[in-house]
């Protein structure tokens, strides 16, 4: 028997943004840390908006 769990992309984007920023900080020099952190944050915000408002996430009920 296979149990399929509902997947919510919006719920996953913020933790992935923090993980990506942490990876960028650990891998890059101090001069580029801020740039990559901002880029990753903007991408994660765009993904969050996409999953919540465009895809109309019904799993987590985050949409107002």
Swiss-Prot record:
Signal peptide residues are: 1-26
Swiss-Prot/TrEMBL keywords: Host membrane, Membrane, Signal, Transmembrane, Transmembrane helix
Q: Which ranges does the record mark as transmembrane?
A: 33-53
Top-rank lineage group of the source organism: Viruses
Keyword Signal on this protein? Answer: yes
> How is it placed in the membrane, per its record?
Single-pass membrane protein
A GO CC annotation recorded here is:
membrane
Q: Where in the cell is it found?
A: Host membrane
**What protein family is recorded?**
Belongs to the IIV-6 010R family.
Protein name as catalogued: Uncharacterized protein 043R
Q: Which organism is it from?
A: Invertebrate iridescent virus 3
């Amino acid at each position: 028997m296979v149990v399929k769990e509902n997947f919510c992309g919006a719920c996953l984007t913020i933790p992935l943004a923090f993980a990506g920023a942490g990876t960028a900080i650990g891998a890059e020099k101090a001069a580029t840390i801020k740039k990559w952190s901002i880029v990753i944050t903007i991408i994660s915000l765009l993904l969050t908006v996409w999953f919540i408002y465009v895809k109309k996430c019904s799993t987590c009920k985050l949409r107002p």
